[in-house]
């Protein structure tokens, strides 16, 4: 069968087969959606207008055991996913240099939803998950949260040039060392 739903330690297929798993990776391509999640999760994650309730476009404080890497639209998808994966590993283990409280996350989500709906409604096509053309701001927030010591220089120049993956590798390397336990 195909994927039907999650259980505590397994993925259950449509034919009833249980596949034991420590992790499940969703690779949806370009069609946005998470139809396999229970309605109770959907209601916490997606507003009626299709906007996703995600802090840093990665995590929802009301679904603490779930996070999304590469779920948001970007012109530099691989770099975006790499930054998000590093952020999510630290967030999930409570190891961000600036670990947000649940209330801080909710306030930020509300502020960003208001901004997207009122200032950038065109991004609604992407569930509000498009960081283009705001890559640098998004990456700066993730790096700040992780405690990066090396930061961008010449931000004005960078705004008019493509993202430099090598530079972001240096910024990420300046984050306090952390290995998932």
Name every feature range the model reports, one short phrase each.
Residues 100-108:
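Short catalytic/ligand-gating loop segments at beta-alpha or beta-beta junctions
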Residues 1-101, 120-181:
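Flavin (primarily FAD) cofactor-binding/catalytic cores of flavoenzymes
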Residues 115-117:
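Activation targets extended, charge/polar-rich intrinsically disordered C-terminal tails
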Residues 111-112:
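Extended repeat-based interaction scaffolds and adjacent low-complexity, acidic/S/T/P-biased segments
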């Amino acid at each position: 069968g195909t994927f039907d739903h999650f259980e505590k330690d397994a993925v259950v297929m449509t034919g009833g087969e249980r596949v034991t798993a420590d992790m499940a990776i969703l690779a949806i391509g370009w069609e946005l959606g998470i139809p396999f999640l229970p309605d109770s999760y959907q209601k916490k994650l997606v507003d009626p207008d299709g906007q996703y309730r995600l802090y840093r476009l990665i995590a929802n404080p009301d679904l603490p055991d779930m996070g999304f890497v590469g779920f948001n639209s970007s012109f530099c998808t691989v770099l975006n996913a790499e930054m998000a994966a590093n952020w999510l590993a630290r967030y999930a283990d409570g190891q961000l240099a600036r670990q947000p409280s649940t209330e801080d996350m909710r306030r930020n989500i509300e502020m960003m939803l208001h901004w997207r709906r009122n200032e950038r409604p065109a991004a609604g096509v992407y569930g509000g998950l498009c960081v283009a053309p705001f890559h640098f701001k998004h990456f700066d927030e993730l790096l700040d949260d992780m405690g990066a010591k090396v930061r961008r220089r010449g931000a004005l120049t960078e705004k008019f040039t493509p993202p430099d993956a090598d530079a972001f590798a240096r910024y990420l390397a300046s984050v306090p060392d952390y290995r998932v336990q």
